[in-house]
From Swiss-Prot:
Organism: Moorella thermoacetica (strain ATCC 39073 / JCM 9320)
Similarity field: Belongs to the universal ribosomal protein uS13 family.
Role according to the record: Located at the top of the head of the 30S subunit, it contacts several helices of the 16S rRNA. In the 70S ribosome it contacts the 23S rRNA (bridge B1a) and protein L5 of the 50S subunit (bridge B1b), connecting the 2 subunits; these bridges are implicated in subunit movement. Contacts the tRNAs in the A and P-sites.
Assembly behavior: Part of the 30S ribosomal subunit. Forms a loose heterodimer with protein S19. Forms two bridges to the 50S subunit in the 70S ribosome.
Name of the protein described by the UniProt record: Small ribosomal subunit protein uS13
One GO cellular component, as annotated: cytosol
Length: 123
């Protein structure tokens, strides 16, 4: 099993798909990496030579921000938005959608389950 950027790639998948198991690498970036390193995208991970695995590992380490570094960068960006008090930062702080979606109805994923407001009756 090939281990790249701290992630074990599945042996039975094509390299093009297997690279997408690494956080920060999707299909387009996977194809770009394979073209740059000269590895055939149709090769199965189990059939990769040690040299090909090392080329992929070196290229990803030097040229692509992945896994922990990328997660840290994203969380720091969100934290920065919250600190400067911009609109997007306020939406993050309140747990509401950030990209302009409606919130009168929907947005349940971001807002969480409904809180039913009870009615108090006079006695």
């Amino acid at each position: 099993m090939a281990r790249i950027a701290g992630v074990d790639l599945p042996r039975d998948k094509r390299v093009e798909v297997a690279l997408t198991y690494i956080y920060g690498i999707g299909r387009p970036k996977s194809n770009m990496i394979l073209a740059a390193t000269g590895v055939n995208p149709d090769t199965r991970v189990r059939d990769l030579t040690e040299d090909e695995v090392n080329r992929l590992r070196d290229y990803i380490d030097k040229n692509v921000v992945v896994e922990g570094d990328l997660r840290r960068e994203v969380s720091l960006n969100i934290k920065r938005l919250m600190e400067i008090g911009c609109y997007r930062g306020l939406r993050h702080r309140r747990g509401l959608p950030v990209r302009g979606q409606r919130t009168k109805t929907n947005a349940r994923t971001r807002k969480g389950p409904r809180r039913t407001v009870g009615v108090r009756r006079k006695k």
